[in-house]
Every structure is written in structure tokens, then in C-alpha cells.
């Protein structure tokens, strides 16, 4: 699964290069998580893990605090979690996760991003069966075997643990993602480089020429949409 981690790193690097957009998206995600339950992260697991993920993107504390304070107030913006599936050039597959307060706007924007760049939006389930929902947790370390043994002792369903470039990368079943992160904290691991629930493709495709150019443009347009939180795909992008 090493290549999957490489793809995560590439996506994180691209997002880190556009901080204002990342901060705005996390602000909404934190607001929604805080509004859906207790605004105290210690009493709201969903909020706690969104904050943990935000920290891996270096989202400043004041952005996090402002979103939580907004949730405590009288504002009551209604957001919907949506997933769109579609096809890019030459058989590439794309899943788009969105968080929106205007479903019609988001659907139109996502459809246009596909259609104008050699792709087309499909129905629910059109491509998701070719992806595996996977928890991915990364942190500094070099003993993958020790971490695997520790997590197995905690009865956590682990798909794989690898060491790569001074990082331990843990791949879990989605239902054990949060349990694994809590167990690692109990072990004294306080700083994570990645905490993601990713739709990992079962197989990747390689694009070339115009197909690659159109796909990368489509990806940029989708990720620039304010309502889009994540874009998953099965393309092995060149480094």
C-alpha cells in the first residue's frame, strides 16, 4: 500500500500550498461537527477527530476555535454531506465528497467540472465498488512490527503497517480507524502526520498526454470548489 501513502502525501502537499482554501474548508467541517453534538471536543468524538485531522494540515488554533465558537452561537446553517461519483478521461474513476448548504449549487458545479474536462458524472455506486474505505494513520517511527503487534493486542483490525521514509503508516478497517488512533495516543504518540479516511482504489490507471492534462485540470477544478472536502481517484499521477 506504499503508493497509496505517496498519493496522500501528494494531495497534502497540494493542499498545504493553498492554505486559505484549506482553512475555509476545515472551518466548515469543524462547525458542522461541533453543531451536530457537544461543542467540547472531549465530549464529541466526531469533532475531536476532525480537529486532529485539521492539525495534520497545520490549521491554526484560532481557525479551529472560531468555528467552534460559531457553533455555540445562534447561527444555524444547515449543511448536507454528499458524495458524487463519476468518470474522468480514459476510464479513470473519481469520488467527490462535499459538505454544502446549497445542494443544487454543488451538484451543478461538480457536474460542470466533470463535463468540461473530458469526464461525466455517474449515479451513486457507479465507481465506489472499485474502492476500499480505509483508515490511514501516519506518524514518525521506524518499527512497523512493534506497532502491528501492539494494535493487534488491542483487538484492532489492521490491514497493514509499513515503514516508509521515517514514517509508520497504519492502514485500518474504517470502523477501527478512531480506535486505532486512540490506542496510539495511549502508547504515547501525540503528533500525527496523517489521519484520513480514504477511498483507496483497488487498481490504479496511468494516463498520458491530453488525457492526463484533462484529468489534472478536472482534479484542480473539483478541489477548488468551496463545497468539496475530498476528491478520491484511481489515477497514478506522475511525481
From Swiss-Prot:
NCBIfam families xrefs: PRK00110.1 (NF001030), PRK12378.1 (NF009044), YebC/PmpR family DNA-binding transcriptional regulator (TIGR01033)
InterPro entries listed in its UniProt record: Integrase-like_N, TACO1_YebC-like_2nd/3rd_dom, TACO1_YebC_N, Transcrip_reg_TACO1-like, Transcrip_reg_TACO1-like_dom3, Transcrip_reg_TACO1_YeeN, YebC-like
GO-annotated biological processes: regulation of DNA-templated transcription
Pfam families named among the record's database cross-references: TACO1_YebC_N (PF20772), Transcrip_reg (PF01709)
Location in the cell: Cytoplasm
HAMAP family to which the protein is assigned, alphabetical: Transcrip_reg_TACO1, Transcrip_reg_TACO1_YeeN
Keyword check for GTP-binding: no
Family: Belongs to the TACO1 family. YeeN subfamily.
Entry keyword set: Cytoplasm, DNA-binding, Transcription, Transcription regulation
Gene3D superfamilies recorded: 1.10.10.200, 3.30.70.980
Molecular function terms, GO-annotated: DNA binding
Domain of life: Bacteria
Protein name: Probable transcriptional regulatory protein EF_2866
Species classification: Bacteria, Bacillati, Bacillota, Bacilli, Lactobacillales
A GO CC term assigned to this protein in UniProt: cytosol
Organism: Enterococcus faecalis (strain ATCC 700802 / V583)
Amino acid at each position: 500500500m506504499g503508493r497509496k501513502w505517496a498519493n496522500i502525501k501528494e494531495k497534502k502537499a497540494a493542499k498545504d500550498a493553498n492554505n486559505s482554501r484549506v482553512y475555509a474548508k476545515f472551518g466548515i467541517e469543524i462547525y458542522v461537527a461541533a453543531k451536530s453534538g457537544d461543542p467540547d471536543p472531549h465530549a464529541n468524538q466526531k469533532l475531536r477527530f476532525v480537529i486532529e485531522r485539521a492539525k495534520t494540515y497545520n490549521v491554526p488554533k484560532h481557525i479551529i476555535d472560531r468555528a467552534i465558537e460559531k457553533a455555540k452561537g445562534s447561527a444555524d446553517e444547515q449543511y448536507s454531506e454528499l458524495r458524487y461519483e463519476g468518470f474522468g478521461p480514459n476510464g479513470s474513476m473519481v469520488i467527490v465528497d462535499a459538505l454544502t448548504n446549497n445542494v443544487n449549487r454543488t451538484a451543478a458545479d461538480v457536474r460542470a467540472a466533470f463535463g468540461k474536462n473530458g469526464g461525466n458524472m455517474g449515479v451513486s455506486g457507479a465507481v465506489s465498488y472499485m474502492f476500499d474505505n480505509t483508515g490511514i494513520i501516519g506518524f514518525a517511527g521506524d518499527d512497523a512490527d512493534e506497532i502491528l503487534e501492539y494494535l493487534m493486542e488491542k483487538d484492532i483490525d489492521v490491514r497493514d503497517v509499513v515503514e516508509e521514509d521515517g514514517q509508520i503508516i497504519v492502514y485500518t478497517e474504517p470502523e477501527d480507524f478512531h480506535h486505532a488512533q486512540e490506542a496510539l495516543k495511549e502508547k504515547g504518540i501525540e503528533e500525527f502526520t496523517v489521519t484520513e479516511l480514504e477511498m483507496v482504489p483497488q487498481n490504479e490507471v496511468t494516463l498520458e498526454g491530453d488525457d492526463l492534462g484533462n484529468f489534472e485540470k478536472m482534479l484542480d477544478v473539483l478541489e477548488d470548489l468551496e463545497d468539496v472536502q475530498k476528491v478520491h481517484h484511481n489515477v497514478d499521477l506522475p511525481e
